[in-house]
Curated annotation (Swiss-Prot):
Part of giant hemoglobin C1, V1 and V2. This worm has three different extracellular Hbs: two dissolved in the vascular blood, V1 (CA. 3,500 kDa) and V2 (CA. 400 kDa), and one in the coelomic fluid, C1 (CA. 400 kDa). V1 consists of four heme-containing, globin chains (B-E) and four linker chains (L1-L4). V2 consists of six globin chains (A-F) and C1 consists of five globin chains (A-E). SUPFAM superfamilies: Globin-like (SSF46458). Heme b binds at residue 96. The lineage of its organism: Eukaryota, Metazoa, Spiralia, Lophotrochozoa, Annelida. Belongs to the globin family. This is Giant hemoglobins B chain. It comes from Riftia pachyptila (Vent tube worm). One of its GO terms (cellular component) is hemoglobin complex. Pfam families: Globin.
Length: 144
């Protein structure tokens, strides 16, 4: 099995920084990820009624997408600071426990994030063997 060791964590942080970018590219990146999520899990839209999951072009959903990516950005930044990362993951776990998010949903989002990063930085440099275990560290922490 692949591990999320110190080198993998640094690589994920570097590749994320390149993919996440800034400004308008962040909105496009979020749109790519959520389009992928809902394409592969249409029923997941129901979990986002409060933020207009029925239409990812609305200001309400775009704001939600920005918050999610901001949270992921923080978690990735903390990959090499485990005590602080674990505190952040516990906070996110509390926010998600009442939302009915299942393991398969996290898998779908992980896959969409990896596709998004690969789409921006290119398949020749994207390191799935680092991303998979490191995203699992984050999503396992959120699942509690």
């Amino acid at each position: 099995d692949y591990v999320c060791g110190p080198l993998q964590r640094l690589k994920v942080k570097r590749q994320w920084a390149e993919a996440y970018g800034s400004g308008n590219s962040r909105e496009e990146f979020g749109h790519f990820i959520w389009s992928h999520v809902f394409q592969h899990s249409p029923a997941a839209r129901d979990m986002f009624k409060r933020v207009r999951g029925d239409n990812i072009h609305t200001p309400a959903f775009r704001a939600h997408a920005t918050r999610v990516l901001g949270g992921l950005d923080m978690c990735i930044a903390l990959l090499d600071d485990e005590p602080v990362l674990n505190t952040q993951l516990a906070h996110l776990a509390k926010q998600h426990e009442t939302r009915g998010v299942e393991a398969a949903h996290y898998d779908t989002v992980n896959h969409a994030v990896m596709m998004g990063v690969e789409n921006v930085i290119g398949s020749e440099v994207f390191d799935q063997d680092a991303w998979k275990p490191c995203l699992n560290v984050i999503t396992n922490g959120i699942q509690g």
